[in-house]
């Protein structure tokens, strides 16, 4: 049995001028997803996807590189203005935001959507180094 030839999916260029950038910054990684107003993903990137491994994924520089890559992909679809939703306690929040602004996007609003418990689950123990 012969294998079927792998299909090459061409990405069609959408013409979307405004969208939402979701910056999810954890202690271990930073993920950036740019969506349209309905929430359909246009472009995404993360520090791990850009080749950073281990503890280097959680650095602000890795978040900046991931945000620049995601911005470049979104600009290919005609995106010009963004609302930014920042989530999580990580160190890449501000640097990802600065990288999106430096890429030429007009940032209309910045929202912090980090979930805060009303005394929910017990937190992790404090590290003793």
UniProtKB/Swiss-Prot annotation:
Coiled coil: none
InterPro entries on file: Ribosomal_uS11 (IPR001971), Ribosomal_uS11_bac-type (IPR019981), Ribosomal_uS11_CS (IPR018102), Ribosomal_uS11_sf (IPR036967)
One Gene Ontology CC term in the entry: ribosome
Keyword Amino-acid biosynthesis listed: no
Pfam entry (one): Ribosomal_S11
Source species, domain of life: Bacteria
GO terms, biological process: translation
One MF annotation (Gene Ontology) recorded for this entry: structural constituent of ribosome
Keywords: Ribonucleoprotein, Ribosomal protein, RNA-binding, rRNA-binding
Keyword Lipid biosynthesis: no
Subunit comment: Part of the 30S ribosomal subunit. Interacts with proteins S7 and S18. Binds to IF-3.
Protein purpose: Located on the platform of the 30S subunit, it bridges several disparate RNA helices of the 16S rRNA. Forms part of the Shine-Dalgarno cleft in the 70S ribosome.
Family, as annotated: Belongs to the universal ribosomal protein uS11 family.
UniProt-recorded name of the protein: Small ribosomal subunit protein uS11
Originating species: Agrobacterium fabrum (strain C58 / ATCC 33970) (Agrobacterium tumefaciens (strain C58))
Gene designation per UniProt: rpsK
